[in-house]
Amino acid sequence: MSNPRHNEREVRSPRGDELNAKSWLTEAPLRMLMNNLDPDVAERPHELVVYGGIGRAARTWDDFDRIVATLKTLNDDETLLVQSGKPVGVFRTHKDAPRVLIANSNLVPHWANWDHFNELDKKGLAMYGQMTAGSWIYIGAQGIVQGTYETFVEAGRQHYGGNLKGRWILTGGLGGMGGAQPLAAVMAGACCLAVECDETRADFRLRTRYVDEKTHSLDEALAKIDAWTKAGEAKSIALIGNAAEIFPELVKRGVKPDIVTDQTSAHDPVHGYLPLGWTVAEWRAKQENDPKAVEKAARASMKVQVQAMLDFWNAGIPTVDYGNNIRQMALEEGLENAFAFPGFVPAYIRPLFCRGIGPFRWAALSGDPEDIAKTDAKVKELLPDNKHLHNWLDMAKERIAFQGLPARICWVGLGDRHRLGLAFNEMVRNGELKAPIVIGRDHLDSGSVASPNRKTEAMKDGSDAVSDWPLLNALLNTASGATWVSLHHGGGVGMGFSQHAGMVICCDGTEDADRRLERVLWNDPATGVMRHADAGYDIALDWARKQGLRLPAILGN
């Protein structure tokens, strides 16, 4: 029997200004869906897997074909509904409604666990959408580079006087998200040793210039790190190995990194984490024929790695969970103090979220890198005093290789996003850009996710698990006229541990787009300021007042 999720075809997004659909509002999701499965973008495109273990763009290849065919014929007063990667309906709405509404991996809370999801997945009744995989706005490892860079820079400020020169970071995982870590570390001025069990992933990062070198030898990796740090160079190396083996070995040897974190796909104990002592081939085979054995062995191995991270923490080394739920897995395996070290958001990033600043991104549907160069320049023009952002854009231009359609990640917040969107739309209208731009973001944004072990960890008022906020975010983006809106469960940290929403809006150069952009790109980050103001953060309360937000129960206006 053939596998409906496997096909050897190669998918790439169309380029240029010629439409394959009836309008740019349907051409945009068509191109971004296809871009998610570009072999230069996706981790395992032949299996529809974009990143993050089994984060897929469509449920089956037949569903992919149906989505493509539907988008090509969708009218400007119709909306396509996608249920866990399957196109289930087309309904008449209106021209300012989203052209696509997506719900992925959502389960009633009592059944929101991997066992139940995997049972549904095996029957072909569900699809894991991760965050930007099933919502068609993944842009490769660049999508998390700036957030990781901001994290490392802030860690440097807090622990090392703002200077990471001569310092090094230990981490694990070089998948679609973790692959950003070596480059982010180097951009922040540090060296990086990244442990990866799957050599093909390390090779992918070498090919796209996200990591500088590769080795199979721990001794060689440490020697290079030592030489680079002594010389004040910022370089990175991928070590082929198992983090659950390497981290404890480093503790045993008394090796002391300057920062420790991890971005293995520990959120998925079957498909995301190689058990100690197993080969990758054995692991892949047993995922299909004995998933329970894989999960048991993987969880035990995670406990070993987290114990090593605790050992680093107890030795005074800054150590953070980078949002993959590995501490939770270790806790469930009996490691009672697994949460002794913090997550990266409460440790370093939350003040940005309080001002609605987060992973704003855009992609050039033309496929021409020059369109991104022009938008980079426009960002600098409109935000002339943000030298930190200018520095980021300069580094990104020099260091980041585009994957698939040219794109840019750029952390900006409430008060700036709508200005950039309107400027980009004007550039499309006057012909400065060769084709429309789409603007989206990661689901891990200021007001669009509830994830108690990641983004909403240790909220000031204890509201970590309240998931009304991403639901309201999705509803508001729908009402505001985003081009497509998504609502997912389980991204980043796995089943039962998160709910989150995404939006993408197309700058097609029209005046209608101006109105939609102004609404969406104001309201979307404003929900994040609202959420943090409601939790009692002074930065958010001050920013809400400065931006004139009307928050009756929070500001009394």
Swiss-Prot record:
<dbReference type="GO" id="GO:0019557">
    <property type="term" value="P:L-histidine catabolic process to glutamate and formate"/>
</dbReference>
<keyword id="KW-0520">NAD</keyword>
<feature type="binding site">
    <location>
        <position position="196"/>
    </location>
    <ligand>
        <name>NAD(+)</name>
    </ligand>
</feature>
<keyword id="KW-0369">Histidine metabolism</keyword>
<feature type="binding site">
    <location>
        <position position="130"/>
    </location>
    <ligand>
        <name>NAD(+)</name>
    </ligand>
</feature>
<dbReference type="InterPro" id="IPR036190">
    <property type="entry name" value="Urocanase_sf"/>
</dbReference>
<feature type="binding site">
    <location>
        <begin position="52"/>
        <end position="53"/>
    </location>
    <ligand>
        <name>NAD(+)</name>
    </ligand>
</feature>
<dbReference type="GO" id="GO:0019556">
    <property type="term" value="P:L-histidine catabolic process to glutamate and formamide"/>
</dbReference>
<feature type="binding site">
    <location>
        <position position="492"/>
    </location>
    <ligand>
        <name>NAD(+)</name>
    </ligand>
</feature>
<dbReference type="InterPro" id="IPR035401">
    <property type="entry name" value="Urocanase_C"/>
</dbReference>
<dbReference type="GO" id="GO:0016153">
    <property type="term" value="F:urocanate hydratase activity"/>
</dbReference>
<dbReference type="InterPro" id="IPR038364">
    <property type="entry name" value="Urocanase_central_sf"/>
</dbReference>
<feature type="binding site">
    <location>
        <position position="322"/>
    </location>
    <ligand>
        <name>NAD(+)</name>
    </ligand>
</feature>
<feature type="region of interest" description="Disordered">
    <location>
        <begin position="1"/>
        <end position="20"/>
    </location>
</feature>
<comment type="similarity">
    <text>Belongs to the urocanase family.</text>
</comment>
<feature type="binding site">
    <location>
        <begin position="263"/>
        <end position="267"/>
    </location>
    <ligand>
        <name>NAD(+)</name>
    </ligand>
</feature>
<keyword id="KW-0963">Cytoplasm</keyword>
<dbReference type="GO" id="GO:0005737">
    <property type="term" value="C:cytoplasm"/>
</dbReference>
<dbReference type="Pfam" id="PF01175">
    <property type="entry name" value="Urocanase"/>
</dbReference>
<dbReference type="Pfam" id="PF17392">
    <property type="entry name" value="Urocanase_C"/>
</dbReference>
<comment type="function">
    <text>Catalyzes the conversion of urocanate to 4-imidazolone-5-propionate.</text>
</comment>
<feature type="binding site">
    <location>
        <begin position="273"/>
        <end position="274"/>
    </location>
    <ligand>
        <name>NAD(+)</name>
    </ligand>
</feature>
<dbReference type="InterPro" id="IPR023637">
    <property type="entry name" value="Urocanase-like"/>
</dbReference>
<dbReference type="InterPro" id="IPR035400">
    <property type="entry name" value="Urocanase_N"/>
</dbReference>
<feature type="binding site">
    <location>
        <position position="201"/>
    </location>
    <ligand>
        <name>NAD(+)</name>
    </ligand>
</feature>
<dbReference type="Pfam" id="PF17391">
    <property type="entry name" value="Urocanase_N"/>
</dbReference>
<dbReference type="InterPro" id="IPR055351">
    <property type="entry name" value="Urocanase"/>
</dbReference>
<feature type="active site">
    <location>
        <position position="410"/>
    </location>
</feature>
<dbReference type="InterPro" id="IPR035085">
    <property type="entry name" value="Urocanase_Rossmann-like"/>
</dbReference>
<feature type="binding site">
    <location>
        <begin position="176"/>
        <end position="178"/>
    </location>
    <ligand>
        <name>NAD(+)</name>
    </ligand>
</feature>
<protein>
    <recommendedName>
        <fullName>Urocanate hydratase</fullName>
        <ecNumber>4.2.1.49</ecNumber>
    </recommendedName>
</protein>
<comment type="pathway">
    <text>Amino-acid degradation; L-histidine degradation into L-glutamate; N-formimidoyl-L-glutamate from L-histidine: step 2/3.</text>
</comment>
<feature type="binding site">
    <location>
        <begin position="242"/>
        <end position="243"/>
    </location>
    <ligand>
        <name>NAD(+)</name>
    </ligand>
</feature>
<keyword id="KW-0456">Lyase</keyword>
